[in-house]
Amino acid sequence: MSDVQVSDHPEVERYEISVDGRRAGLAAYELEGDVIAFTHTEIDDAYEGQGLGSQLARAALDDARARGLKVKPLCPFIRGWIKRHEDYQDLVVPTT
C-alpha cells in the first residue's frame, strides 16, 4: 500500500499530495482574509484514476474548515467536488 500525504505549502499557496514521497498533484489557492479561493487543481498523468484528486480536495477542504475559512471554488474540479459532497457546501462563500 502506498503512503499518501497531503500538506499545505502556504509560501507558494498550494496544497500538495504526494505518493511515497513524490509529488503527485496540487491544489493552488489564493488566501484573502478568511476566504480561500481554489484556482487550479491538477494530478500528474502517472497518478490519474487513483482517486488522488478527491483525496486532495477532501484534505484541503477539511483544513479550510478547521481553520475557519470560507471557500471560493474558482477551480472547476473543486467546484464539482463540493457539488457532489453536500457536507462541504456550507464552506462556500455565497455569491452576490
Residue ranges of each PLM-predicted region?
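Conserved beta-strand in the GNAT
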Residues: 22-30, 37
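Histidine-centered active-site/metal-ligand motif
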Residues: 9, 40, 85
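Conserved N-terminal entry element of GNAT/NAT acetyltransferase domains
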Residues: 1-8
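Conserved acetyl-CoA-binding loop-helix of GNAT-fold acetyltransferases
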Residues: 49-60
